[in-house]
């Protein structure tokens, strides 16, 4: 077989192959119409505004009224529900939102405008910032020489009572309660012919800072109003620590404490009246803490 015959044979084979091949017709699929996204202006509901005491997420509870009655007695997160082993999305978001509020309260400061409005005398402990305040509680109990002089110059020596306000671990607690509780304390003290004048405001305040203030001023009673460590229930809880003639290094048992002062606990006006009564009793009995019967 010569070259020419080989070419003819190959062409024949190719012709047979192409001739026997069937072609399929593919119908073009029309393109789908593009749907335009419509954006509307609106607002997302604030889940932190929901009253947990009135919210019941359990579907078809056996005793709905009894469940809600129990929830009215506590701010605990009762009556939640789940998707499989997990909490519902709404529950998780509310938890994170409340946790964020607590964090913000710890790391924020009391407004300087409020300090000026209330005519407080501002001083600072040895802490330079929030990080040092949180990691070095010992520095939040002490004042340097400059601050000692500021305290001495702006207080009455050997007064019967010295009121101190401290930011503590919750600036929100001070901003939410201080305007209500101070007039209540003042009004209550009038019943016992007692009063107070200049109020010290302590930035980066730890509770034992009141002990050094007691030694500087020589006051018979020192009352510290300070922000409590915030939790998931509220970031606005304040405490009152009161001591008769406090001294540096004294045992904690010498302090009398009124805690949970906020709108959902002991109202500030009510707490103020009770604080005034305690101060009077301390001055009468010359003691505080567990010694105060």
Curated annotation (Swiss-Prot):
EC number: 4.3.1.7
Compartments, as annotated in UniProt: Bacterial microcompartment
UniProt-recorded Gene Ontology molecular function terms: cobalamin binding; ethanolamine ammonia-lyase activity
Enzymatic class: lyase
Cellular component terms per the entry's GO annotation: ethanolamine ammonia-lyase complex; ethanolamine degradation polyhedral organelle
Binding note for cofactor: Binds between the large and small subunits.
Cofactor field: adenosylcob(III)alamin
Binding site for adenosylcob(III)alamin: 207, 228
Superkingdom classification of source: Bacteria
Keywords attached to this entry: Bacterial microcompartment, Cobalamin, Cobalt, Lyase
Keyword Zinc carried by entry: no
Catalyzed reactions per annotation: ethanolamine = acetaldehyde + NH4(+)
Pathway: Amine and polyamine degradation; ethanolamine degradation
GO biological process, one term: ethanolamine catabolic process
Pfam families, sorted: EutC
Function: Catalyzes the deamination of various vicinal amino-alcohols to oxo compounds. Allows this organism to utilize ethanolamine as the sole source of nitrogen and carbon in the presence of external vitamin B12.
HAMAP family assigned: EutC
PANTHER family: ETHANOLAMINE AMMONIA-LYASE LIGHT CHAIN (PTHR39330), ETHANOLAMINE AMMONIA-LYASE SMALL SUBUNIT (PTHR39330:SF1)
Family: Belongs to the EutC family.
Subunit structure: The basic unit is a heterodimer which dimerizes to form tetramers. The heterotetramers trimerize; 6 large subunits form a core ring with 6 small subunits projecting outwards.
Name assigned to this protein: Ethanolamine ammonia-lyase small subunit
Species the sequence originates in: Listeria welshimeri serovar 6b (strain ATCC 35897 / DSM 20650 / CCUG 15529 / CIP 8149 / NCTC 11857 / SLCC 5334 / V8)
Phylogenetic placement of the source organism: Bacteria, Bacillati, Bacillota, Bacilli, Bacillales
């Amino acid at each position: 077989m010569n070259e020419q015959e080989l070419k003819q044979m190959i062409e024949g084979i190719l012709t047979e192959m192409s001739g026997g091949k069937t072609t399929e017709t593919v119908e073009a699929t029309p393109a789908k119409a593009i749907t335009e996204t419509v954006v509307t202006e609106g607002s997302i509901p604030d889940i932190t505004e929901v009253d947990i005491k009135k919210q019941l997420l359990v579907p078809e509870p056996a005793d709905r009224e009894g469940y809600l009655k129990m929830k009215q007695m506590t701010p605990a997160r009762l009556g939640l529900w789940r998707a499989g082993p997990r909490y519902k999305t709404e529950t998780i978001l509310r938890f994170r939102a409340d946790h964020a509020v607590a964090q913000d309260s710890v790391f924020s400061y009391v407004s300087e405008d409020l300090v000026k409005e209330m005519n407080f005398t501002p001083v600072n402990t040895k802490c330079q910032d929030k990080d040092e305040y949180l990691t070095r509680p010992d520095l939040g109990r002490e004042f340097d020489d400059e601050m000692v002089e500021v305290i001495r110059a702006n207080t009455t020596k050997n007064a019967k009572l010295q009121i101190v306000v401290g930011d503590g671990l919750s600036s929100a607690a001070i901003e939410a309660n201080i305007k209500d509780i101070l007039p209540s304390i003042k009004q209550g003290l009038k019943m016992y012919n007692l009063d107070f004048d200049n109020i010290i405001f302590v930035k980066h305040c730890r509770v034992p800072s009141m002990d050094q203030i007691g030694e500087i001023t020589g006051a018979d009673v020192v009352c510290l109003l300070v922000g409590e460590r915030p939790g998931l229930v509220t970031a606005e809880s304040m405490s009152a620590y009161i001591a008769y003639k406090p001294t540096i290094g004294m045992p904690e048992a010498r302090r009398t404490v009124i805690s949970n002062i906020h709108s959902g606990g002991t109202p500030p006006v009510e707490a103020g009246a009770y604080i005034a009564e305690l101060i009077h009793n301390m001055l009468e009995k010359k003691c505080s803490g567990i010694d105060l019967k």
